[in-house]
Regions:
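Gly/Pro-rich cap/lid or specificity-loop segments adjacent to the active site
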Residues: 28-339, 409-588
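Extended, H/D-rich, highly charged conserved domains that either
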Residues: 380-389, 393, 397-405
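P-loop NTPase catalytic cores that bind/hydrolyze ATP
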Residues: 332-362
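Second-shell loop/turn segments in exported
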Residues: 193-194, 342-345, 398
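Glycine-rich, aromatic-lined ligand/substrate-binding cores of catalytic
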Residues: 352-355, 366-370, 403, 415
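Fungal secretory targeting signals
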Residues: 1-27, 247
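Short edge-strand/loop segments of extracellular domains
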Residues: 96, 363-366
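Amphipathic alpha-helical substructures
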Residues: 365-382
Length: 588
């Protein structure tokens, strides 16, 4: 999911100032139609349709006069509508934690702009500890060291399939030791001040500073996945500044801040539904559309037989890993836990299920040459890309390594100290595996906080309900959830929207498979989102939408139906589809 280059803040500052002319000394350029912005924007060197800037904020908001600062890197796709139709800025967070906002705008900023008729400046930023925002957490002084450590985690992986007993505990002990080696590197080498000040509350306060610097009187926000936690935190501490807020793919913010292991449990409630959808849609599509829908002896699969077939592949790889002599990512092996990891990530994007089915058939046949880069690249970002001297291309057009590293200071720093034992960690893996067919993969993330030493300077621990003191927001938040999302279940969206109350929240539910509404496009959902952002129309709580047919497995019939849509609706669905199939990692 993440990519290849880690560049320190000092190096970036020098390169940017000398090579691309983005420096804090630049003359202020205000947003068109406003003369109150105090952010200096200039054309980005990599994607000329976007503008970039640095913006300084206090390192520690509990001690703002300490003199230490964080340099936030921002990027925006300017509004294209006539000046009298513009609505200000729409801030986007792609999730994570640790998602690069600058990469998001560079990659899909124009698509988001099209969704809102060009009436907003589409803006985002690299949160603390992420990409070009500095100073870096600096746990590792080279990309190689971090990549090597991630490779070790990859090869050890979650204990799957479970074998039980001392062998399983020993496996988890080794995995935890590898994860702890990263934590130790942060203790020995890292920027401790930054590691303690990269939490969600600090980023929410950065957003407030950015809004003020833009000269705007409140926040318009679109947050995906972890972005729902960031948005909900902002709404909880600055309810008067919420102008428009869509939280799509809703995570349980209370569990996130209270108990990282419970947050993991809450996240996999609907993973079984997503996996069942992968199986059932394949069977329904048939062999002509889904390569897994036919057996080796040319018989039609059933849901039960296909499920057993995939279980058999896991067992085979668990007993004897597949050896890869060469591939784009080099030689290696594919183990059961590697397959499960990629399967989990592919549950996010139902538009890619037909490709996944083809890959699995090839893997069954003992050919993992083309599949192995997915093990290294999709999950750990180690697929090599052509070298370029342009630092922006190296940092923003691929997903940066320090973004992967930022998961720990954000996720682990936001939660209380995790003192789970090795045996407790092993038990947690087994528990999560029973909750979900791929629960071990989220256990690997949540349990990875074991032994993390740095707590965020500020953490928000509530209230999370009106009854306990949560204040009314200036404008209602729109929560959006698919009913079969593998990582942010519908139950979390119901809990969060109920917590903010009927005066401050409304929930839109969409039938569909994948992570966030972009994963399974719906014209109904899109119409409601546009009405909310463009006209201030809040959908009735509990509004239910269905996806457009033919997204997962297109047919001539569904193509014919789509051709009957208006030019505008076809264009909007096409844009959402591009976001859903983009390389931007939306979510955790």
């Amino acid at each position: 999911m993440w990519a290849n280059l880690r560049v320190t803040s000092a190096a970036i500052s020098g390169l940017v100032a000398s090579h691309v002319g983005i420096a804090r000394a630049l003359t202020i350029e205000s947003r068109q139609g406003s003369n109150t912005s105090t952010i200096s924007w200039t054309t980005c060197p990599d994607v000329n349709s976007t503008q970039c800037a640095f913006f300084d904020v206090p390192m520690d908001y509990t001690n703002p006069n300490s003199g230490s600062t964080v340099s936030i890197f921002l990027r925006r796709y300017p509004a294209t509508a006539p000046a009298d139709q513009r609505l200000g800025s729409l801030m986007v967070n792609p999730g994570g934690p640790g998602g690069s906002g600058s990469y998001t705008i560079a990659t899909i900023g124009d698509y988001i702009s099209t969704m809102v008729d060009g009436r907003y400046d589409i803006i985002s930023f690299d949160p603390r500890a992420v990409n070009l925002t500095g100073p870096s957490t600096a746990c590792h002084d080279s990309e190689y060291k971090f990549a090597d450590r991630m490779h070790q985690v990859n090869m050890q992986g979650a204990p799957f399939p479970h074998v039980g007993g001392a062998g399983e505990t020993a496996h988890v002990a080794k995995l935890s030791a590898i994860q702890s080696s990263h934590h130790a590197a942060c203790v020995e080498n890292g920027n401790h001040e930054m590691l303690r000040n990269s939490g969600t509350v600090a980023v929410a306060k950065d957003m407030e500073r950015i809004v003020e610097a833009l000269g705007e009187d409140g926040l318009n926000f679109l947050g995906y996945s972890y972005g729902s936690i960031l948005g909900a935190t902002f709404a909880a501490i600055r309810p008067n500044l919420v102008k428009r807020m869509i939280l799509d793919g809703v995570s349980d913010a209370e569990a996130y801040f209270t108990d990282v292991l419970e947050w993991g449990r809450s996240g996999v409630q609907d993973t079984p539904k997503a996996f069942a959808g992968f199986i059932s849609t394949c069977i329904d599509a048939g062999p002509a559309q889904c390569a897994l829908a036919v057996t080796k002896d040319n018989k039609t699969e059933t849901i039960e037989s296909l499920t057993k077939r995939l279980d058999a592949l896991y067992t085979r790889l668990g007993n004897e890993p597949l050896v890869i002599g060469d591939s784009l990512a080099g030689p290696g092996i594919i183990q059961a836990q590697n397959l499960q990891s990629v399967m989990f990530s592919m549950m996010y994007n139902s538009g890619g299920w037909s490709s996944l089915a083809r890959d699995l058939v090839v893997l069954e046949q003992g050919n993992g040459r083309d599949y192995y880069p997915a093990v290294s690249g999709i999950v750990y970002g180690t697929v090599p890309e052509p070298y370029t001297q342009n630092v922006f291309n190296r940092s923003m057009q691929s997903y940066p390594a320090n973004t992967r590293e930022s998961v720990y200071p954000i996720l682990c720093g936001d939660s209380p100290q995790s003192n789970i034992t090795v045996q407790g960690y092993a038990d947690y893996f087994r528990e999560m595996g029973k909750l979900s067919p791929m629960g071990e993969q989220l256990a690997l993330i949540a349990g990875g906080c074991r032994g993390w030493s740095f707590r965020a300077t500020e953490r928000y621990t509530g209230p999370w309900t009106v009854e306990k003191g949560l204040k009314k927001t200036r404008f209602p938040i729109l929560f959006v959830s698919l009913d079969a999302d593998p990582i942010t279940p519908l139950a979390s969206a119901v809990k969060m929207s109920n917590g903010f109350g009927s005066e401050s929240a409304s929930l839109l539910i969409q039938q569909g498979f994948g992570h966030t509404s972009n994963a399974h496009p719906s014209l109904c959902t899109l119409t409601n989102l546009r009405g909310y952002l463009l006209d201030g129309k809040v959908p009735k709580n509990g509004t239910y939408c269905t996806p457009e047919p033919g997204w997962i497995y297109p047919t001539n019939s569904t193509a014919s139906k789509r051709s009957m849509l208006s030019k505008r609706d076809k264009g909007l669905l096409e844009v959402v589809g591009k976001i859903g199939r983009s390389k931007v990692p939306i979510g955790f």
